[in-house]
UniProtKB/Swiss-Prot annotation:
Keywords: Ribonucleoprotein, Ribosomal protein. Gene3D superfamilies: 2.30.30.30. It comes from the Archaea. GO terms for biological process: ribosomal large subunit biogenesis; translation. It comes from Ignicoccus hospitalis (strain KIN4/I / DSM 18386 / JCM 14125). InterPro entries: KOW (IPR005824), Rib_uL2_dom2 (IPR014722), Ribosomal_eL14 (IPR039660), Ribosomal_eL14_arc (IPR023651), Translation_prot_SH3-like_sf (IPR008991). CDD domains: eL14. Belongs to the eukaryotic ribosomal protein eL14 family. GO terms for cellular component: cytosolic large ribosomal subunit. NCBIfam families: PRK04333.1. One of its GO terms (molecular function) is structural constituent of ribosome. Signal peptide: none annotated. HAMAP family: Ribosomal_eL14. This is Large ribosomal subunit protein eL14.
């Protein structure tokens, strides 16, 4: 099971969309992929993203390479992942050692 593949559901871990879930739509090269939320579902626009900024999940939707947002949204609904995709992931921030004594 390859981690980075078309249809794989991922969590964005860097940038202003951090914590939101997205679906890989296309593989651009060995460092970049095309992802979408889609925007109507959770606000993530279709865009190019570095794979280092994604955390792949164990879920996958059946879409073809380069599928448009309507087809991705339909595949998410068929897989029963609509509510799952809307939920945001809150990252656990590490506590710096200097603040550990105050907690």
């Amino acid at each position: 099971m390859p981690a980075i593949e078309v249809g794989r559901v991922c969590v964005i871990i860097a940038g202003r969309r951090a914590g939101k879930k997205c679906v890989i739509v296309d593989l651009i090269d060995d460092k970049f992929v095309l992802v979408t939320g889609p925007k109507e579902l959770n606000g993530v626009k279709r865009r190019r993203m570095n794979i280092k900024h994604l955390e792949p999940l164990d879920k996958k939707v059946e879409i073809e390479k380069g599928a448009d947002d309507a087809k991705v949204l339909e595949a998410i609904r068929q897989a029963g992942l609509e509510e799952f995709m809307k939920e945001e992931v809150k990252p656990e921030l590490p506590v710096p050692p200097s603040l550990g004594a105050y907690l």
